[in-house]
């Protein structure tokens, strides 16, 4: 009887405790959350997670936008997340009220790597100072040094050579494209390219690959929601953190080597430029130019600049396999404008069709449907709702890239979406492939140069064909918790007839 009484008492205590937890959760921040935008009712502790596909959360957001409109709230566990959908609302938030929405939310996978340092995850003064420096450094690389264009042209030449070794045979282009894009970043960060079999180059490439594998995986999604719990379990996230740390150590070692022979009047690479800035501001107690920010800003160039650009190129060539007539039209324009010489950035304005194809690949691919999460920097009024300071905010870029009011054929791959009736390239205000506002991709200019020069240099020499008929090729990007990435594919690379 005593045992039964004890069990009954414990059971009742558990039930009461559970009810108390639910009531506390339901009333947590009730006053501050009372004017949040509407959204689906959350389940205690889990929020709206049971309704969400962790590999494609943007699909739920697109569905909810039809019901709740351009501003709504979802709950990731116990945290409210405000989603902003549609061109006008996104512009109003991230451009018109850009300062309020300019913060970077805590994204645990990235935060564990960065410890809060670097341009990608920081907010406020740190973000502004590092972003301004990065943009200016990349922009001025052509002054007294090899220009960005020359660096990309060199890698394009190496890529053509590498593809030539596989002509008339089956190849998966992923590694070749990752290597050439990775070496562009190496040339900027370290001042020189690496051979593909160099151990340090392979370390960096493996670190970037591991980083995005975790970001794109279910365990990465769970880590971002429950970091302390997931940290306690085995998984590839531990291996990823270890190899990324090795890459960070290598960057630090390279900085220490350069510091010994640094010419402050003529820095030769990104690291040296950062070191010069550190020396200039060494007596400023509020400076953001320190070792931690140097290493993480350099790492961010690899993390943000390698996978995104190489993935877009992979998707581009997959589209050429799927649509041979589009590939032929691009090659015709290449022959007419460039001929057999080396492609240059100046050629782009004379090649509206090719430019439209590249833009359409980015629009259709929709690489990052919600961008990297933002947060509001202070209590913010938006569309008659109250968003408390620190709340995570997601711009639903997908809602703009498939808006029929902005694009003629939003559900199809159609370069005409970026051409007028005369075949002239037409800019589109809804082209948010690089994000929008104060946190738009700082490497956009570099990415545009890479996409154009790599794409034209390769199609100038080669034609891509599939291992199966075009109608059987799936061009829909594979969804992951990070974004929409191209599917793995094999193809034939055939040498074109000399013109």
Swiss-Prot record:
Transmembrane segments: none annotated. PROSITE patterns: CYTOCHROME_P450. Signal peptide: none annotated. One of its GO terms (cellular component) is membrane. In kidney and in liver from juvenile and sexually mature trout from both sexes. Keywords: Endoplasmic reticulum, Heme, Iron, Membrane, Metal-binding, Microsome, Monooxygenase, Oxidoreductase. It catalyses: an organic molecule + reduced [NADPH--hemoprotein reductase] + O2 = an alcohol + oxidized [NADPH--hemoprotein reductase] + H2O + H(+). Heme binds at residue 441. One of its GO terms (molecular function) is iron ion binding. It comes from the Eukaryota. The keyword Lipoprotein does not apply. One of its GO terms (biological process) is lauric acid metabolic process. Its cofactor is heme. It is a peripheral membrane protein. The keyword Heme applies. Its EC number is 1.14.14.1. It is found in: Endoplasmic reticulum membrane; Microsome membrane. Has (omega-6)-hydroxylation activity toward lauric acid. Belongs to the cytochrome P450 family. PANTHER family: CYTOCHROME P450 2C44, CYTOCHROME P450 508A4-RELATED. This is Cytochrome P450 2M1. It comes from Oncorhynchus mykiss (Rainbow trout).
């Amino acid at each position: 009887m005593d045992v039964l009484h004890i069990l009954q008492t414990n059971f009742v205590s558990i039930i009461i405790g559970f009810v108390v937890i639910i009531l506390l959760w339901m009333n947590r921040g009730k006053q501050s959350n009372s004017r949040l935008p509407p959204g689906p009712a959350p389940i205690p502790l889990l929020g709206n997670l049971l309704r969400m596909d962790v590999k494609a959360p943007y699909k739920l957001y697109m569905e909810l936008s039809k019901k709740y409109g351009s501003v709504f709230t979802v709950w990731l566990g116990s945290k409210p997340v405000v989603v902003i959908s549609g061109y006008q609302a996104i512009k109003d938030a991230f451009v018109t009220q850009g300062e309020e929405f300019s913060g970077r939310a805590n994204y645990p996978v990235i935060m564990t790597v960065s410890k809060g340092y670097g341009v990608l995850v920081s907010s406020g003064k740190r973000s502004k100072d590092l972003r301004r420096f990065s943009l200016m450094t990349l922009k001025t690389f052509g002054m007294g040094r090899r220009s960005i264009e020359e660096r990309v042209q060199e890698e394009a030449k190496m890529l053509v050579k590498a593809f030539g070794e596989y002509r008339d045979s089956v190849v998966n282009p992923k590694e070749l494209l990752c290597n050439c894009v990775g070496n562009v970043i190496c040339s900027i960060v370290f001042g020189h390219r690496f051979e593909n079999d160099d151990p340090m180059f392979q370390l960096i490439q493996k670190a970037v690959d591991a980083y995005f594998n975790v970001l794109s995986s279910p365990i990465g999604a769970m880590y971002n929601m429950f970091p302390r719990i997931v940290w306690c379990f085995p998984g590839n996230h531990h291996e990823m953190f270890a190899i990324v740390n090795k890459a960070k150590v290598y960057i630090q070692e390279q900085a220490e080597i350069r510091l010994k022979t640094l010419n402050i009047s003529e820095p030769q690479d990104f690291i040296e430029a950062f070191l010069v800035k550190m020396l200039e501001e060494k007596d400023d107690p509020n400076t953001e130019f320190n070792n931690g920010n140097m290493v993480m800003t350099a790492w961010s160039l690899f993390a943000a600049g390698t996978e995104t650009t190489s993935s877009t190129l992979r998707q581009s060539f997959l589209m050429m396999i799927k649509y041979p007539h589009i590939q032929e039209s691009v090659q015709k324009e290449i022959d007419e404008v460039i001929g057999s010489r080396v492609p240059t950035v100046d050629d782009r304005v004379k090649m509206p069709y090719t430019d439209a194809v590249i833009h359409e690949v980015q629009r259709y691919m929709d690489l990052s449907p919600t961008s990297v999460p933002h947060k509001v920097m202070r209590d913010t009024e938006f569309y008659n709702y109250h968003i408390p300071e620190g709340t995570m905010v997601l711009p639903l870029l997908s809602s703009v890239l498939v808006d029929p009011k902005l694009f003629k054929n939003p559900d199809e791959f159609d370069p005409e979406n970026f051409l007028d009736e005369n075949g002239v390239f037409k800019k589109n205000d809804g082209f948010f492939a690089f994000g929008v506002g104060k946190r738009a991709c700082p490497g956009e200019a570099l990415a545009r140069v890479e996409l154009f020069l790599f794409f034209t240099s390769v199609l100038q020499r080669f034609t891509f064909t599939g291992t199966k008929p075009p109608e059987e090729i799936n061009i829909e990007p594979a969804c992951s918790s990070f974004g929409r990435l191209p599917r793995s594919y094999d193809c034939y690379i055939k040498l074109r007839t000399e013109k």
